[in-house]
Amino acid sequence: MFDIQKTEEFDEWLSNLADQKAQAKIVSRIERLGFGNPGDVKPVGAGVSEMRVPHGPGYRVYFKQTGKTVVLLLCGGDKSTQEKDIKRAKEIAAEL
């Protein structure tokens, strides 16, 4: 089991999503991640991974695992902002 922690940037992104069904799907995926079942995830570099949520525009959650039990949710976005979001996630990870 993992301790899931969130950055303020991630919390703000998630709470500002207009699509409540998308919010619920993302929260569900985060809960699964907490139980060690990340699903559709791929590394994007600098220790950051991208969790893909197949809903709407293709939501993405960027996270970094620290140690064996802590996962930090860095930021989120969708397929249309993927390159910018990956760059931002790496910046946040470097600041931690």
What kind of region is each of these model predictions?
Residues 17, 33, 72-74:
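Generic leucine side-chain signal with a strong bias for well-ordered alpha-helical environments
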